[in-house]
Amino acid sequence: MTAAAPGITRAPATMLPLSYLMAAAIAFLLACAGAASLAGPLTAHYYQPRVVALAHTVTLGWISLSIMGASYQLIPVVLERTMWSERLGRWQLGMLLTGIAGMVTHFFIGRWPGLLMAAAMVALGAGMHLVNVAMTLRGLGRFSFTARLMTMGFAGFGLTALFGLLLGADRIWKFLPTAFFPTLHAHFHLALLGWVAPMIMGVSARAYPMFLLAPEPDGWPAPAQLWGLALGVPAVVGGLTAWPALVLPGAFAVSAAVVGHLTWVARMARDRKRPRLDWGLRFVLTGGAFLFAGASLGLGLALDLFSGPRVAMAYTALALGGWASLTIVGMMLKIVPFLVWYRVYSSRAGRAPVPTLAQLGWPAAEGLAYGLLTCGMAGLAAALAAGSAPLIFAAGAVLAAGSLCFCTTLARMLWHLAACGQRPVPTMGAHTA
């Protein structure tokens, strides 16, 4: 068995990551419904109270909670380290849910003092997670590619939370020396490129080979991703806030990371031994196609080939909605069945008939969710670029239907938890060699 972190004898119980993931799924459903209800405001500039509230429902409520929840299950498996404190993770979730709800509400009504208080709670919750991860990784002997990118991502998460807190305070006291919109753009790209991108790229390097039954990736894409993000993210953020000449080199560096990641994904899909792709795998692979489209549009913005708020919102939809969201949906369709099966059936395996992981899913609903969400994300990006309220509403309605199918699938998986009763549940241990 692999070594555990100092002073730790067990990994978090399955309900801890499930709690995060279910809260995130609810936020995803609300965000998709919100896209339809805000069709009118989404045809105008992106900096409006209700649009910013929607954006933070996606980035904090959906994406960030998903990544944090998944980390409580993936770190023991991918990095072979048991989590430091399950109790801290539970307290952190309460802090984050309260803070995120407060931020979204105060963004919606445009009240800055209340927003700042809620942002402070989110920053505190983020800090608690970073402490938990830091203590978990303490003493890790070898930092693999995945460990390095995840460490980079958690550092980016902390900086993004701090940056957002400063932006909120600046709306009250006006102390930041830089112009507001370039600073806002820097905050967004720090979140996207410094937090979301390294986490997805790092985890996929270990998780996708397991899911696809493919060889672990190697070669030039590893340094391309690592150095592309390590050099590109500071350059983009610094260029947007202070030195515009850095934006283009930073964009090219990030593009190199994207090319490296997509090359790995394509190789794993080509060399896989799994003959048939389930819907979770189709989601993550389709997310790669959206990443290519979003990165191309982002590079075009850096080259001044495109400009304006409509193109910027289409770029955001491709990056956060197409790539990040579809990838997370696919990962959830792989992670949640495992967590439910482990909690309900692991102690009975070998002694009584138990369902397989595949039997916990609902392929019909997953397939419907795939069709609706992929078409809805593509349609939303096109509708935002066109600035058409009817098209945005239609795309939002399709997304809402797709997210409902996704959440219904998760609910059907969670129904198996009712079989637990009062039976003692084993704790999910770290992955063994």
State what each model feature region is.
Residues 1-433:
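Hydrophobic alpha-helical transmembrane segments of multi-pass integral membrane proteins
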